[in-house]
Amino acid sequence: VRFAQIFTLLLTMYLAPLSLRAQSENDMVNFLQAGPSDASKLMNAYLNPVIEGLSYGFNGGWYTTAKAHKTLGFDIGVSFNAVFIPSSNNYFDPNSLGLETITDFTSTAANGLAPTIVGPEDETIYYVDLNGDNQTDANFDGPQGLDFKEQIKISGVLAPTAQIGIGIYKNTDLKIRWMPE
């Protein structure tokens, strides 16, 4: 029973942000209005805390038996590695990205920065100069943060993995790991 409760809690923590992700993905399309180069920089900065957290999470949880399997002996396991994201990753500074077409931005955040995907639901407006004449040609709303700390009560991500260990030859094991896209 205890395992079922823990598994349900972990699964809920993993799936809760996914329902919110659809809104954020639609908002991220707005970054394309800044042109390919700036859009790429803005998307990377916005998503960086989750990407970095998942990369740490996928590197954790490697486990093995102390003794190598016999030839074709195997074990199967599933793990959820929790990675906490520090509050310093709630915002990014668009001015530090070396943007080419974004001339300015405004933010409702008290610190004047743009929220990352894990950050609060602050609003950011970007101003774009597409033809280089120092005049604003367009503006667009950037995506708000999904406020992980408020929505799921923890600032972190879960990295689920499945692992299979197979004995192949003379005390040698092959480990195969699957991670969701």
Predicted features along the sequence, with ranges:
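Bacterial Sec-dependent N-terminal signal peptides
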Residues: 1-25
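Transmembrane beta-barrel domains of Gram-negative outer membranes and organellar outer membranes
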Residues: 24-181
